[in-house]
């Protein structure tokens, strides 16, 4: 008589490991409009690597192969020839997880930043090499002048900032500066 029955048997949330939740969060991300034109790329994340490289946009495809462009080829060369590091022994990440022409860079950075911070928080890397001016500003709250070419420590992480790959391609004299920056990172790695 006027009563209704409601089935309150709720589905319990799946207790997935945190890293699986984050990976699925990145893979299924739709926090900004970039995902409409590109599939999110987690990057090569090795939590035990001693060295991490971070670019603004992905340099790897979803199969973890380097993209077929000059920036990705330059990064691969830096990792293998300058740092003499096998790809399996490093992490290659990006701030933005989708590669497309920017629609609203600030909004996209805000949407993706927590994914990258989680990856860094769960990384054992001794040195994190960041490319370009946007990353040190967003991760460390430091300008180019304050961060480029020096080891900057934040919590237990050590960052080295250098020129963006695209800037080095446009202005080859920046490659010499970047090489000097990389030598600082190598010295730091060898000391620790």
Could you tell me what each predicted segment is?
Residues 1-192:
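A polyanion-binding, active-site-adjacent surface
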